[in-house]
Amino acid sequence: MGTKREAILKVLENLTPEELKKFKMKLGTVPLREGFERIPRGALGQLDIVDLTDKLVASYYEDYAAELVVAVLRDMRMLEEAARLQRAA
């Protein structure tokens, strides 16, 4: 079993370019736990999947980053991908 970071990376790698763009947009609207700050939208725009994964883990730590990715995927109605990440993480 891999790390949560690897699980996040694998799920994000399966998104189409349009889905990834939507994911980044929705990441800016998902409610955050107290004590965490949003990653500025401008900082997300040019990130590739590996850099986005690194930014998520650096900003929110692995556990919470995985929870956020699941929340965004659910908001996008990508329930299969969200469930896959939950099982892997």
Curated annotation (Swiss-Prot):
GO terms for biological process: innate immune response; negative regulation of canonical NF-kappaB signal transduction; negative regulation of interleukin-1-mediated signaling pathway; negative regulation of tumor necrosis factor-mediated signaling pathway; positive regulation of interleukin-1 beta production. Predominantly expressed in monocytes, macrophages and granulocytes. The gene is PYDC1. It is found in: Cytoplasm. Its main location: cytoplasm. This is Pyrin domain-containing protein 1. One of its GO terms (molecular function) is protein serine/threonine kinase inhibitor activity. One of its GO terms (cellular component) is nucleus.
